[in-house]
């Protein structure tokens, strides 16, 4: 959402996804934010600054340095402002992550094993890379998918669907109950299973 605010206000991409220093990127966001009044991002940002950092001002280009310094100081010294602390203070009960079918879900396993974590973190199955045969890297991805299910290669459509089914089952064991799809287009052509 922050990137959208920045892009819609003409901020050069090098300050959004580029390699400019974090402080400069924050400055550009702060300068763009006042143009988002009425957009939830404007209100969320200022509400978060108030609730978590005790800042009663409004973030803009003129206050960016003050906010940057305040937030960085509090993040370094306030034990309530750890990732877990922020999640717990926000009364978050469930976090869904977006995960690729070949992911090992290592951190999901670690979180599940930690009895001190009181909220649920579950993976979501996002098989985009297994869908579009025209995307660069598709063949390499299929080789990785084959390897993760213990196969040398996936030589037929049934092999691919079986591999994806195995990964869905693994994800389900790890708490997955949702999938997430980012399709560039929806290919459709009537075909029989044999075709």
How should these model regions be labeled?
Residues 1-195:
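Metal-cofactor-binding active-site regions of metalloenzymes
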């Amino acid at each position: 959402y922050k990137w959208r605010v920045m892009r819609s206000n003409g901020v050069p991409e090098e300050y959004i996804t580029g390699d400019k220093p974090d402080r400069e990127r924050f400055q550009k966001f702060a300068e763009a934010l006042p143009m988002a009044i009425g957009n939830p991002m404007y209100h969320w940002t200022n509400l978060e600054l108030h609730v978590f950092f005790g800042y009663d001002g409004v973030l803009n280009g003129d206050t960016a340095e003050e906010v940057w310094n305040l937030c960085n100081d509090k993040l370094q010294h306030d034990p309530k402002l750890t990732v877990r602390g922020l999640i717990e203070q926000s009364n978050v009960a469930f976090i869904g992550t977006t995960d690729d079918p070949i992911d090992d879900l290592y951190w999901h396993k670690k979180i599940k094993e930690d009895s001190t974590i009181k909220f649920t973190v579950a993976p979501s199955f996002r098989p985009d890379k297994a869908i579009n045969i025209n995307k660069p890297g598709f063949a390499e991805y299929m080789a990785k998918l084959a390897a993760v299910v213990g196969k040398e290669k996936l030589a037929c459509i049934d092999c691919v669907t079986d591999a994806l089914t195995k990964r869905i089952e693994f994800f389900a064991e790890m708490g997955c109950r949702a999938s997430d799809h980012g399709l560039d287009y929806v290919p459709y052509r009537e075909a029989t299973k044999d075709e």
